[in-house]
Amino acid sequence: MTKIRSVVLGCGSYLPEQVVTNAQLAARIDTSDEWIVQRTGIRERHIAAEGEFTSHLAIKAAQAALTDAGVDAQSIDLIVLATSTPDNTFPATAVAVQHGLGINHGAAFDLQAVCSGFVFALATADNFLRTGAFKRALVIGAETFSRILDWNDRGTCVLFGDGAGAVVLEAQEQPGSAATDRGVVTTHLRSDGRHKAKLFVDGGPSSTQTVGHLRMEGREVFKHAVGMITDVIVDAFEATGLNADSIDWFVPHQANKRIIDASAHKLHIAPEKVVLTVDRHGNTSAASIPLALAVARKDGRIKRGDLILLEAMGGGFTWGSALVRW
């Protein structure tokens, strides 16, 4: 029996021009390039310019994705934007993106699941498309985490960067086989609020009337990450009858190279199948997966028909996985 799948038509990304290296950070705070690389794998990150907002990054990534897909912005009837750093409390940054693209129809809204945001947004758009409510969607992850960092906290300020990535999805009829269908094959989302104090921002417009800064218990996050990530990936494999040998590329959330390496090892995924961009992007939260997809697509690694495994974990905790055939 045939199925409607959300097929990826194209992807795109945008990174701010300013690059901050580990050496530049070491000149400001008590850290070193060796310390950062050894613990995280990060060597540099991009930082948004003054006056450059999350919506600006998202619009540029969306435009690149539309160009890659070969479709007009007016054909988009759904925009789902994953971000933890919106331009304003309201309206949604997605409507600013919609307006910036010259679209005044359909629906646009933000989704917040921190670093898991893109996987959550992908799953949300996929469900809308498969029901027939919408035909063609932009799924965007965009962040300006530099605005919520405590630049005196060496445990967090060295980790994050700014950027945006996007994919264009279209509802298409497929044969109905997880083994061959193009598009989003399966998604699995999880949350557990018992861990909300382990990674959070210590402020909020409705509680403290402040923006606040990112706070993290790094060891606690690391301790939970690998187990949660692998469990939700196993869920994806069990739901489809696929396995680690089936996938062509593993595109994880780019938080920390040690977490990525440990997850791939536990799942028996060969290192050469892992797409890594954390060294040059840092942790861009909801933007990291679409940024990595765009890199691997542009350099020719990801090709039509490839099966891609996505995973992410973020504050909350939230975590999720997706299997997508390009």
Curated annotation (Swiss-Prot):
Record GO terms (molecular function): 3-oxoacyl-[acyl-carrier-protein] synthase activity; beta-ketoacyl-acyl-carrier-protein synthase III activity
Keywords: Acyltransferase, Cytoplasm, Fatty acid biosynthesis, Fatty acid metabolism, Lipid biosynthesis, Lipid metabolism, Multifunctional enzyme, Transferase
Reaction(s) this enzyme catalyzes, per UniProt: malonyl-[ACP] + acetyl-CoA + H(+) = 3-oxobutanoyl-[ACP] + CO2 + CoA
Active site residues according to the UniProt entry: 115, 253, 283
GO cellular component term, pick one: cytoplasm
Iron-sulfur listed as a keyword: no
EC number(s) recorded for this UniProt protein: 2.3.1.180
Keyword Acyltransferase part of the UniProt annotation: yes
Taxonomy, superkingdom: Bacteria
Pathway it works in: Lipid metabolism; fatty acid biosynthesis
InterPro entries in alphabetical order: ACP_syn_III_C (IPR013747), ACP_syn_III_N (IPR013751), FabH (IPR004655), Thiolase-like (IPR016039)
GO biological process: fatty acid biosynthetic process
UniProt-annotated stretches for the region ACP-binding: 254-258
Gene3D superfamilies documented for this protein: 3.40.47.10
Subcellular location: Cytoplasm
SUPFAM superfamilies, A to Z: Thiolase-like
Enzyme class name: transferase
Assembly notes: Homodimer.
HAMAP family for this protein: FabH
Entry's free-text remark on domains: The last Arg residue of the ACP-binding site is essential for the weak association between ACP/AcpP and FabH.
Function statement: Catalyzes the condensation reaction of fatty acid synthesis by the addition to an acyl acceptor of two carbons from malonyl-ACP. Catalyzes the first condensation reaction which initiates fatty acid synthesis and may therefore play a role in governing the total rate of fatty acid production. Possesses both acetoacetyl-ACP synthase and acetyl transacylase activities. Its substrate specificity determines the biosynthesis of branched-chain and/or straight-chain of fatty acids.
Family: Belongs to the thiolase-like superfamily. FabH family.
NCBIfam families assigned: fabH (TIGR00747), PRK09352.1 (NF006829)
Protein name, entry field: Beta-ketoacyl-[acyl-carrier-protein] synthase III
Organism: Bradyrhizobium diazoefficiens (strain JCM 10833 / BCRC 13528 / IAM 13628 / NBRC 14792 / USDA 110)
Record lineage: Bacteria, Pseudomonadati, Pseudomonadota, Alphaproteobacteria, Hyphomicrobiales
The gene coding this protein: fabH
